[in-house]
């Protein structure tokens, strides 16, 4: 600098001056008196020199005293000498350095002119200079990278135009510092130098296309970037030198590193002014705008909405109540209220208001309010799911163990928990989630009950995770994550609770619950039911006594953290509840040992209790309980709706705890556990029901009353224990009066409904019907529930007025139509609660004994159940009731069979368990459909199978899958109507084939619905995918196949596919054959009644589905269904599921007959069965039938030959049954006994075959390996591996191998067990998929071509190409992505086909469903066209290159299908 130059230009002079001036500087000197001015200026230069010298050194900071001029000058001279020496050395070495190509290390190497630009480029920020007027004198070009402004745009522009208004003062302080240079720097003040570092917010230029404006106009224009500025003031000495420069601030600005960014304050506030009527006249959000926290506008909006919205169960909104207090007291604080932001963040808010009076007249003029907001951290966004078991604890603290805590956190923790529960529940998968998370949730009592399911917890957890993760939000499992999942919204209101999954509205239950639940006003209660169920489940898992009471307890409790943990907080809430549930709560856990009778009672009573809780309007439910007794008969229709809302969870809950929780349910939320699992399914349904209730009822109070009636009726009827609940509810009812909330609630409901799309609407309506049935039977057993369901239909028969009311309320549901479809169901149901209980007891006995003979009542109940199930598949009641019922059944069975209630068998196979909770319900549906006769027993049998087949977890898994299917079906039941209608064409042929065909038809329909339902709930793909991996690990290929099927179709479908057959195989024996025949007949009638179905669909608002159902093309139906499902829940599982259903179906559609498509793809299970019969028949019916007969014969022969006990046996049995059934479509007369015998024979055969196949698989593998090496035709390899397939392969060996599989219908059954067996034994991972494949070798040689035609034929073909028969299948060539998945994909696709023939058929499906491509492949043989011929015709396929990709040409669609399956896998 000039100063430095002056002082140091002459070192000798400087030294001299220093020596001479040192003494003088220490004190005044007369000699210098005349040079005072020069001295002052010299001092300035010295100070500046000191700063320059020490600028790059910290030495100055080490001085404890101000360094004197002598020291400063001495240091200056020292540094100048060093610099000169370095420059000399650099100059001396520069030539050598450059010659040696070594970068110079001398400081003087960099050119002075280049240094500046280089430094600017290296800057982690931009450089700008501001003059005293605040104008930007210079800014570097890279400012565009930070603020999107061009250099020209900022030059000569006021810096304050880009600075946040809140930072102007700070910037001015730095721009105009107190004289830092004129002697003030030595005062000891911290800023000794004129350099400073400070943070400021700079405006980021809005995008030119206003992309951001679309999101938030204001925020888009006011987006600020926090910059860290290092500023240096231009030395005044320059100006004093006479230069024409102004003092300026030189700054380097960079983004503040995340780690250095100060944590944004969690508290925010904004101010409003209201007139004396409480209307907002002014809104000041400047403080929040200045804070620049993301989402502040949404925060303000939602806060005002929450504050001024009237909530159900409350006469006044927070704002009105607070306004009255302010006018009365002059100053008031509102209670803390909570809500959630669009991103799910929970916010706790409190408003402080003051009345402002005129200074002159002292008259009140206005009210000023400060709204203080605190954002709560998202504690468990998706982690609870992921943490699964850990979740139990988190949930326990947050949601399950202490809804009260939740309540404390959110005020409506119950809601939140319920939400989480609901979220789980919303997807059938979530139900499974619940089951697995239950353990995880600990609070998922129902799931815990389904501990066996919990065995599936790993799977379930996976499922749950997947389900949740999408969910997303998966708030499904999020009960444990009350904060995030149970967004404040959830907590805030029952409706809010509904939003955990998709924070507010994915399941609209939140919104809808918000409204309806709000109507009940036990925000917590509405979710309370869910919450209760969750709490109960959690408490159960934790061993705590959870009381629905708290949730049920009054909304007051809920509001005031009344949802105190159902477990821990129970007593207080119960106290508030008036001990409504306190007994029940603890009774729930205290009296779990009561007998089944107690259970039945508990089922009813807990249902009643839980219904209120479960219902979105728990409070109203509770209140209505008290009033419900008197008013119960006044509006039974709406009561039914409310019961639906309340019972669905209840049904689920009781089912999980048939024995141990029977009393718990009775006394407490014993039924809660069930709701946890059913929440996902019932949430939407309830949401729809609530929506309808809102429409039907004039006010929340009415809803509350209705709820009371709905819950009170059953509750009061079933047990007096609910009376306290009634009281509590009654307490809440006063709060219910809020009618203003109706508009908002309706809006929310409508809004959420939109999200639910068509299916949810269907579901609620159906669900309402289900509710009717549910209230009566909260029993654990599906049969009981079904019976109740029937009862609900019965009510139609019994109390015509009630039915009429219900029909009126549920016009869309067309209650009358459902009964018409299933007249038997109603007649069966006419029995009162006593009959229901009797039926329940019978079912319990069936479950416990799993004896083929069931009480007539039980059988009727089962029949009704199947009918009802079938009837109500659309309602989704099955999904809920059946799932719940199924769960109870499975649980019960497992409890009896496996020492553990459910864990023994289910735990052995995590999938088994999970599929059971979620899939069991479906199983119930499918079982009831597939095993209509065996419905209850089938379910039980399924459970029993699980219990008996702990090692073959997959077999139980089949049932589990079935359960899932049933649950899904229940959830899907709504779609099922449409699906049934859609698939009637496909299903009709099936029916034509045989009763099994009917079953198949139902199952495909259910399956079709299942995917959509799953998608709606959680998305089948997630579960599917999760299932697939577990399948890989599972040693039970066929069971796995069903699971895959479920994954493909939607876990639920699997169960349909395989579980119905499995159930039929074992269950026909266990169950009186008459039931199966009757159920089949009923199913046939119901399915045949397309008009009724169509009407129901129309009532459900599914004209599209109806039209689709009318369409004869199953392809369309399946694809449409999948599409619809995807549309309904595309976000949840659109890709996976859509691709699976659409792609797989689409692929199948082109590849297979439409029938095949419909049945094979969507209904995987049914499809395969149907397809081989109807599907193949249309294409090559003649061949298929003979093939079927041949296959049947082969199956028997092979079964005898190959007696290998394999889980696939069950699948195989079902396959055989399917085969037999398809083979015996004309054998419809065959009674259940005959079928049972056949099934037994088939099972034995399959056992033998599988043993043989296992042995053969090794051989086949070796042969396949050799064959692959030799390109042996599958037939060449098949002979060893495919005794049954051999016959078909014999037809066209290369093609025959493929074709045999189309004919392989039977062969597939034969080989299926063998393949399955071989596959299963060969590799657990492979076995899940390979099970279908049969043996990798077989698959490659035979199955491969067949498989290739099958859904994943290409994948399989490539897999075969892989070389390892087993691993080649696994090899991802076709499934590329999924080496293991390829098995799963194949399995899945195969499952699609396999789904129908779970074991044998699953393999068969491999072969037939394999695409009917196999059949197609065998098209030349069988006449199946499309894929098959292409593949078969493909020389590569026919030739030794069975495994070559040449098979792919005809298999492209299959490959797509496979890909789709992969997605699901």
Curated annotation (Swiss-Prot):
Sequence segments annotated as region (Interaction with BMAL1): 730-1121
Motif position, LXXLL motif 2: 690-694
Motif LXXLL motif 4, residue numbers: 878-882
Occurrences of domain bHLH (ranges): 26-83
Polar residues composition bias: residue spans: 1-11, 451-486, 658-671, 1311-1325
Location of Omega-N-methylarginine modifications: 1261
Placement of sequence motif LLXXLXXXL motif: 1079-1087
Region CASP8AP2-binding: start-end pairs: 691-743
Modified sites of kind N6-acetyllysine: 636, 640, 780, 785
Keywords tagged on the record: Acetylation, Activator, Biological rhythms, Isopeptide bond, Methylation, Nucleus, Phosphoprotein, Repeat, Transcription, Transcription regulation, Ubl conjugation
PTM section of the record: Acetylated. Deacetylation at Lys-780 by SIRT6 stimulates its ability to coactivate PPARA.
Domain comment as written in the entry: Contains four Leu-Xaa-Xaa-Leu-Leu (LXXLL) motifs. The LXXLL motifs are essential for the association with nuclear receptors and are, at least in part, functionally redundant.
Biological function: Transcriptional coactivator for steroid receptors and nuclear receptors. Coactivator of the steroid binding domain (AF-2) but not of the modulating N-terminal domain (AF-1). Required with NCOA1 to control energy balance between white and brown adipose tissues. Critical regulator of glucose metabolism regulation, acts as a RORA coactivator to specifically modulate G6PC1 expression. Involved in the positive regulation of the transcriptional activity of the glucocorticoid receptor NR3C1 by sumoylation enhancer RWDD3.
Protein name in UniProt: Nuclear receptor coactivator 2
Gene for this chain: Ncoa2
């Amino acid at each position: 600098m000039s100063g430095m130059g002056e002082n140091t230009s002459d070192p000798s002079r400087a030294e001299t001056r220093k020596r001479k001036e040192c003494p003088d500087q220490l004190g005044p000197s007369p000699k210098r008196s005349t040079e005072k001015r020069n001295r002052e200026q010299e001092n300035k230069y010295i100070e500046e020199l000191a700063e320059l010298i020490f600028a790059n050194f910290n030495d100055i900071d080490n001085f404890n005293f101000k360094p004197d001029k002598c020291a400063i000058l001495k240091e200056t001279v020292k540094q100048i000498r060093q610099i000169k020496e370095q420059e000399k050395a650099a100059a001396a070495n520069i030539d050598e350095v450059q010659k040696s190509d070594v970068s110079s290390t001398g400081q003087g190497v960099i050119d002075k002119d280049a240094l500046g630009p280089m430094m600017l480029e290296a800057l982690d920020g931009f450089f700008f200079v501001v003059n005293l007027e605040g104008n930007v004198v210079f800014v570097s070009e890279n400012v565009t990278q930070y603020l999107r402004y061009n250099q020209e745009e900022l030059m000569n522009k006021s810096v304050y135009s880009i600075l946040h208004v809140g930072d102007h003062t700070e910037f001015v302080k730095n721009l105009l510092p107190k004289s830092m240079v004129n002697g003030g720097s030595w005062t000891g003040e911290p800023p000794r130098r004129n350099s400073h570092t400070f943070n400021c917010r700079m405006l980021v230029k809005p995008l030119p296309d206003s992309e951001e404006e679309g999101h938030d106009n204001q925020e888009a224009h006011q987006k600020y970037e926090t910059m860290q500025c290092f500023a240096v003031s231009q030395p005044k000495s320059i100006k004093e030198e006479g230069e024409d420069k102004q003092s300026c601030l030189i700054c380097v600005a960079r983004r503040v590193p995340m780690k250095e960014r100060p944590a944004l304050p969690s508290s925010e506030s904004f101010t409003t002014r209201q007139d004396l009527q409480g209307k907002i006249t002014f809104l000041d959000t400047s403080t929040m705008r200045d804070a620049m926290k993301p989402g502040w506008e949404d925060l303000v909006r939602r806060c005002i909405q929450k504050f001024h919205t009237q909530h159900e169960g409350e006469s006044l909104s927070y704002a009105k109540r607070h306004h009255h207090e302010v006018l009365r007291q002059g100053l008031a604080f509102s209670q803390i209220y909570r809500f959630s932001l669009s991103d799910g963040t929970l916010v706790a808010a409190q408003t402080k208001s003051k009345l402002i009076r005129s200074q002159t007249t002292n008259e009140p003029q206005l009210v000023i309010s400060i709204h203080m907001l605190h954002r709560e951290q998202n504690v468990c966004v998706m982690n609870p799911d992921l943490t699964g078991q850990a979740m139990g604890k988190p949930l326990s603290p947050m949601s399950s163990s202490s809804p009260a805590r939740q309540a404390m956190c959110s005020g409506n923790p119950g809601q939140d928990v319920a939400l989480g529960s609901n979220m789980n529940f919303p997807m059938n998968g979530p139900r499974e989630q619940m089951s697995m998370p239950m353990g995880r949730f600990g609070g998922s009592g129902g799931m815990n009950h389904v501990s066996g399911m919990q065995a599936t917890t790993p799977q379930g957890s996976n499922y749950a995770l997947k389900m949740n993760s999408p969910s997303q939000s998966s708030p499904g499992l999020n009960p444990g994550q009350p904060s995030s999942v149970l967004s404040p919204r959830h907590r805030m209101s029952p409706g809010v609770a509904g939003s955990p999954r998709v924070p507010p509205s994915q399941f609209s239950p939140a919104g809808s619950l918000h409204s309806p639940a709000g109507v009940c006003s036990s925000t917590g209660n509405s979710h309370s039911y869910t919450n209760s169920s969750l709490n109960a489940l959690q408490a159960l898992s934790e061993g705590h006594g959870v009381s629905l009471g708290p949730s049920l307890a009054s909304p007051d409790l809920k509001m005031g953290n009344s949802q105190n943990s159902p477990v821990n907080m129970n007593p207080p809430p119960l106290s508030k509840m008036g001990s409504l549930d306190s007994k029940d709560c603890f009774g729930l856990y205290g009296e779990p040992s009561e007998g089944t009778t107690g259970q039945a009672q508990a089922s009813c009573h807990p249902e009643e209790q839980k219904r209120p809780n479960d219902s979105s309007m728990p409070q109203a439910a509770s209140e209505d309980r008290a009033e419900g007794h008197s008013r119960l008969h006044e509006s039974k229709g709406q009561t039914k709706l409310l019961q639906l809302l309340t019972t669905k969870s209840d049904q689920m809950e009781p089912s999980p705890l048939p024995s141990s929780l029977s009393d718990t349910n009775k006394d407490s939320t014993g039924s809660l556990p069930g709701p946890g699992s059913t929440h996902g399914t019932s949430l939407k349904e309830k949401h729809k029901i609530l929506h309808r209730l809102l429409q039907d009822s004039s006010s929340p109070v009415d809803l509350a009353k209705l709820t009371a009636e709905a819950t009170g009726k059953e509750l009061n009827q079933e047990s007096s224990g609910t009376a306290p609940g009634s009281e509590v509810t009654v307490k809440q009812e006063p709060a219910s009066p809020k009618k203003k909330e109706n508009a908002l609630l309706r809006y929310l409901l409508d809004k959420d409904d939109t999200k639910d799309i068509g299916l949810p609407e269907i579901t609620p309506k159906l669900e309402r019907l289900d509710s009717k049935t549910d209230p009566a039977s909260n029993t654990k057993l599906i049969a009981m529930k079904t019976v109740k369901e029937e009862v609900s239909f019965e009510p139609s028969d019994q109390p015509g007025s009630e039915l009429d009311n219900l029909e009126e309320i549920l016009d869309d549901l067309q209650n009358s139509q459902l009964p018409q479809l299933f007249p038997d169901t109603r007649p069966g149901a006419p029995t009162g609660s006593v009959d229901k209980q009797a039926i329940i007891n019978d079912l319990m006995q069936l479950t416990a004994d799993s004896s083929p003979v069931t009480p007539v009542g039980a059988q009727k109940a089962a029949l009704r159940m199947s009918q009802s199930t079938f009837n109500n598949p659309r309602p989704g009641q099955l999904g809920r009731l059946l799932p719940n019922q199924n769960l109870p059944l499975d649980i019960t069975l497992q409890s009896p069979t496996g020492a553990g209630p459910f864990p023994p068998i289910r735990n052995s196979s995590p999938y088994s368990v999970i599929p059971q909770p979620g899939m069991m319900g479906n199983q119930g549906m499918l079982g009831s459909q597939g095993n209509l006769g065996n419905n209850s027993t089938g379910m039980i049998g399924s459970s029993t199978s699980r219990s008996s087949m702990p090692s073959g977890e997959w077999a139980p898994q089949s049932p589990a899958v079935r359960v899932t299917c049933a649950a899904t079906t229940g959830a899907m039941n709504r779609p099922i109507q449409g699906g049934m209608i859609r698939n009637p064409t496909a299903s009709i042929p099936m029916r034509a084939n045989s009763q099994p065909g009917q079953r198949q038809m139902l199952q495909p329909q259910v399956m079709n619905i299942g995917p959509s339902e799953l998608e709606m709930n959680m998305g089948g793909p997630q579960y599917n995918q999760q299932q697939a991996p577990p399948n890989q690990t599972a040693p039970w290929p066929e069971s796995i196949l069903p699971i895959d099927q479920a994954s493909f179709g939607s876990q639920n479908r699997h169960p349909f596919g395989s579980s119905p057959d499995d159930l039929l195989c074992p269950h026909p024996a266990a169950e009186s054959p008459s039931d199966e025949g009757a159920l089949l007949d009923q199913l046939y009638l119901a399915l045949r009644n397309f008009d009724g179905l169509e009407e129901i669909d129309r009532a459900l608002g599914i004209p599209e589905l109806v039209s689709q159902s009318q369409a004869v093309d199953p392809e369309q139906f399946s694809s449409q269904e999948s599409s619809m499902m995807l549309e309904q829940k595309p976000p949840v599982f659109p890709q996976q599921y859509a691709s699976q259903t659409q792609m797989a179906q689409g692929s199948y559609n082109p590849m297979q007959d439409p029938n095949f498509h419909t049945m094979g793809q969507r209904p995987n299970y049914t499809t395969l069965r149907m397809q081989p019969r109807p599907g193949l028949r249309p294409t090559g019916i003649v061949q298929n039938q003979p093939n079927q007969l041949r296959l049947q014969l082969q199956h028997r022969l092979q079964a005898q030959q190959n007696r290998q006990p394999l889980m696939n046996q069950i699948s195989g049995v079902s396959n055989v049954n399917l085969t037999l059934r398809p083979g015996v479509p004309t054998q419809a007369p065959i009674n259940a006994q005959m079928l049972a015998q056949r099934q037994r024979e088939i099972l034995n055969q399959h056992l033998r075959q599988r043993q043989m196949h296992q042995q053969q698989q090794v051989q086949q593998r070796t042969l396949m390996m050799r064959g692959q090496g030799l390109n042996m035709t599958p037939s060449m390899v098949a002979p060893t591996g495919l005794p049954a397939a051999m016959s078909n392969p014999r037809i066209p060996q290369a093609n025959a191998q493929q074709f045999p599989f189309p004919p392989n219908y039977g062969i597939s059954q034969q080989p299926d067990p063998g393949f399955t067996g071989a596959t299963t034994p060969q590799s657990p991972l492979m076995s899940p998929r390979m099970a279908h494949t049969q043996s990798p070798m077989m698959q490659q040689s035979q199955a491969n071509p067949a498989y290739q035609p099958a859904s994943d034929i290409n994948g399989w073909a490539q897999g075969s190409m892989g070389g390892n028969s087993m691993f080649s299948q696994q090899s991802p060539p076709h499934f590329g992505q999924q080496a293991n998945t390829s098995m799963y994909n194949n399995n899945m696709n195969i499952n699609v086909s396999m789904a129908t023939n779970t074991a044998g058929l699953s393999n068969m499906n491999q072969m037939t469903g394999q695409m009917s491509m196999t059949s197609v492949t065998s098209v030349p043989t069988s006449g199946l066209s499309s894929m098959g011929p292409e593949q078969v015709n493909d020389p590569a396929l026919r030739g030794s290159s069975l495994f070559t990709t040449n098979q792919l040409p005809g298999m492209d669609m299959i490959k797509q299908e496979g890909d789709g399956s992969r997605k699901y896998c």
